[in-house]
Structure formats: structure tokens, C-alpha cells
Swiss-Prot record:
Intracellular or extracellular location(s): Cytoplasm
Organism superkingdom: Bacteria
EC number assigned by the record: 3.6.1.-
Protein name as catalogued: Small ribosomal subunit biogenesis GTPase RsgA
Cofactor(s) this protein requires: Zn(2+)
Cofactor binding annotation: Binds 1 zinc ion per subunit.
PANTHER family: SMALL RIBOSOMAL SUBUNIT BIOGENESIS GTPASE RSGA, SMALL RIBOSOMAL SUBUNIT BIOGENESIS GTPASE RSGA 1, MITOCHONDRIAL-RELATED
Amino acid sequence: MTKKKKLTHGQVRRVRNNQHKKLKQEESIVWDEALLGSAQPGLVITRFGQHADIEDPVTGEIHRCNLRRGIESLVSGDNVLWRPGAETLAGISGVVEAVEARSSVLVRPDYYDGLKPVAANVDQMVIVSSVLPELSLNIIDRYLIASETLGIAPLIVLNKIDLLSPELREQYSTWLNDYRAIGYDVLYVSKKTGEGIADLEVKLRDRTNVFVGQSGVGKSSLVNALLPELEEDVEEGAISETSGLGQHTTTAARLYHIPSGGDLIDSPGVREFGLWHLETDDVTKAYVEFRPYLGGCKFRDCKHGDDPGCLLREAVSKGEISALRFDNYHRIVQSMTENKANRQYSRSKKPICKSKLLASLEHLLTEGAIFSNISRPSPLYWNVNHG
């Protein structure tokens, strides 16, 4: 296979300028009401900028539509009312008029924009982890907090298990059995060997599922395994040799129909899942194994640390609560506190140019400067200090 020639900086700049002009042209389209049909239901497949791909539930056809002004929060999985155009103008064939009420919405905190919707009307959150990049139980716990808070059923999937030796697989099973013990489903899968794919299909059937997890854990590879009939495979990411972190592939969440039943939404990978928008009590209640003990501590304001008479700590000492989960709980609460303090401090400072900041971060990530000095004594604690 011939390697693609790398574009020069000038070529990249011209491509971006052409794309920008095209988007401006599409956004400037004003439909004559006489050219629009009657409103009908549709399903959002993906959204980018002021446009969205809407599926007609009757024909299954996909229509690229403009969004009416005032429609801002639109994500994959949303049910909408849209009006088809009598003709296609600059690739646009309709207009989204309204968004129907959601049964659920997965959100994640954005440092600049508050809570950012990721997917709507989700029945199940598929938390994809893998053995490469290293397994982080802390990130699994963060997603479980999100799922419990939002009322979305979680499913834990450990991917790339073909890379595990028998000894390591036994160790990973020991860690993940703590989650099975408190009622969470855990699957071991491998696209390479096919192990667990059939079981995963059964778990996804008749549900709208959102795939979440770090970049590089293989979410897109699982999408390809579940959707073998895709004309073009979803791009699969590699692992940075410098940082050991996954490189982002999916740039916008997209909904797919699974041939064996159910839908799935492949979301952009995140390296950590911030929870600073939640209160400590929300996090505490999201730990399902804590609930029988809450309210029984000696002190009403017990922080569940070294406080005397703490029922949670007593339960940990008796083996009734996982020590690893309990330790992650304190790490998460601490990181939330630190991140909230940093956020409040940054608001009091002069605003920083977002584009310049992102460009600097992109450069650092490319050069492997960020995270390159993180000590990784155990996969249990990797990437745990981000709120």
C-alpha cells in the first residue's frame, strides 16, 4: 500500500480555507418556505457545526440539514422534527425545526462551555477500556459515576484481551470481579480473535448504546467488528509511542444501526472524564456499594476518611467494600476539589485566547510533552489526578 504524501503547511492552509468557505456558503443558505415540505420526525445521526445528518425513519435515507436559529443543543440520538427541501442546495436538503424531549442525555463538563451534551436518548453506556493504553480503574469509576448520576445503565467492556498473558488476565479478572460483585456486567472482548463479540451483540440488542472511553482503547475497532457491512471502516487510532496514550480518531459522535439489533453511538475519545460539575454527595451516592452505609456514620458531616465511626471505612476493613474502589473515590473527590479551585481562579484572571491555548496544547501533545513524566507504578492509578 502506497504511503500518502504528507501535505505541506501551505497546502494544509489552502484546504482549511476552502473548507471554511464551503461551510460559510452552506450557512448562508436561506430556504424559501414554499420550497419546504411538511414537518416530519427524524433521527440525528451526527451533528457538525450548524448542520446535522438526519435519518428519515420511513425510508432510512440520510438528509443533511441546516438548523433553525435557536437550536444549539443537538447531538446524535436526538429525535427531531425536520422539513425536507424541494431540492438540494449546496448539499443541504432540509431544515431541522425542533428537538423533541429527551429521555436521557449524556453530558460531560467542558472547561470553557460548562456541560456539553455528547449523546441523547441513551439506554446503555458502554464503558470501553483496554490493556493498551493501560487499564485505568479510575476512569471506569468516573464513567460509572456519570452513568449512575444520569440513570443510564452501564456495561464495562475490556478490549484487546488477546494482548494479555494468562497471568495478567487472571490479575485483570481479579480487579474487575469487584465490579461484578456489586452488580455491574463486565465483558472481555477482542476484535482480533473475535472473543466476546457475540456476547457484546446480545448486550447491545434493542438498546441505544453510547460507546465511551479513552482514546486508543479500540472503540472504533469494536464498531467495525459490530458493523462489518460499513462501506468504509471507522478510522482506528494508534497509541502514541512517546506518551503511551491513545490518539483521537472519531471527531464527532455518530449513531450506527447494528445489524443484530440496537443502535450504537461512537463518541469522541476522552483521556479523562471530568466530574467537577458534581457535588461530593453526588459522587458518594453514585457508588452503589456505599448506599447501605450512608447516613449511619458517627458524624453527619463524615468525610469517610480518618473520621472516627465511619461505616464506609469499617466496611472496607471487613472486605465488604473494595479497597481499590474506596481509594479511587477519595482520589476523584480530591481531584474535583482541586479542579473547582483552579476553575474559580482562572475565572478571576484575564481571559486567554482559546485558539492559542488549543494550538499550544496540540503542539505539546504532538511532541509528547504532556503526561510524558507521569509515573505509572500501576494501571490502577494511571491518569487519576484530573477532575
